[in-house]
């Protein structure tokens, strides 16, 4: 058994140590918000936070995250930055098909947690590992700026 802290709750899972965190989340814990996209950490759909850092769960062995704080898309509304990103995503009407959105949102939150006033270049660099097949990159950038403005006003 491997003990994990996910979204503030302790969970024990029976999984091989080399099982990707993505599959533990989806299959063992039935947390399906984190998506499978490529399996090689190139698309960003599987992004979660490990101790606050955006991390690709498709290549992260579950044994590597025991004892660390894991945050998934299911818990993003629990903090100010997450709430602002969720609200901005809806205001700017970012999602089209929606498949990549959980990874996009997780990467955006990680950026805004470190940088409260990102430039376009900062956003592009932070989001460069996330692919949107629908091409909503300009809306994503606008939503991140909107969320940044919201969080600065609340500070």
What is each of the regions a protein language model found here?
Residues 1-155:
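Signature of N-terminal electron-transfer/Fe-S-associated modules in redox systems
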